[in-house]
Amino acid sequence: MARQSKRLAPRRLKRKVSKGVVHIQASFNNTIVTITDSSGGVLAWSSAGACGFRGAKKGTPFAAQTAAETAIRQCIDQGMRQADIIVQGPGNGRETAIRALQLAGVGVSLIRDITSVPHNGCRPPKQRRI
């Protein structure tokens, strides 16, 4: 019979971080919120799909708000007080996720939009016919 190994240390280390960076990736289909420390190590993440939304509901502003609240709650428990926000993508949940972070009690010192805009690069896909 195989021997079971016991885990000695907890899986996720709780770190005390006072300032972090919140990355919001908002597409039309989903919103992903990742919170990192200043060096880029991931502290917490959440997405609309991970919060239980499925299908077209993942792209809604309410789903983005729920994902942001879930992620920031984990970081407030680790002692986060200040955050920079980096937003990427054209999705519906951009503004709602930012508002949810501000209402959660974390001081926002910077909001940066890094959405890439093509200077007429690749040809877009064909138009949908419904």
From Swiss-Prot:
Molecular-function GO terms, alphabetical: rRNA binding; structural constituent of ribosome
Main location: plastid
Protein keywords: Chloroplast, Plastid, Ribonucleoprotein, Ribosomal protein, RNA-binding, rRNA-binding
PROSITE patterns: RIBOSOMAL_S11
Any GO CC annotation of this UniProt entry: chloroplast
Domain of life, source organism: Eukaryota
TM regions (residue ranges): none
Protein location: Plastid, Chloroplast
GO BP annotations, alphabetical order: translation
Family assignment from sequence similarity: Belongs to the universal ribosomal protein uS11 family.
Subunit details: Part of the 30S ribosomal subunit.
Name of the featured protein: Small ribosomal subunit protein uS11c
Organism: Nephroselmis olivacea
